[in-house]
């Protein structure tokens, strides 16, 4: 049996021979330095499915403060636009009440 295995693996690279001879169950956890450990296909550790709220319940104070400031900033901007409209410095259409001849 050993002779048959030997002739079968002649000429093949070392890691290939080890992969074919040694089963995954026979490789111990401490064989990280061997080629077998690196060559065999390892499953990546699966992350658990997220359950419950993704974000923590407690929002950091800095972000909360920034959100509140932004809210008030936007609210003030809205009130300014509603109640104090800006005068157009360059109106798109000239006022029909004033004709260009009167200005000259």
UniProtKB/Swiss-Prot annotation:
Belongs to the HHV-5 UL17 protein family. Pfam families: UL17. The lineage of its organism: Viruses, Duplodnaviria, Heunggongvirae, Peploviricota, Herviviricetes. InterPro entries: Cytomegalovir_UL17. It comes from Human cytomegalovirus (strain Merlin). This is Protein UL17.
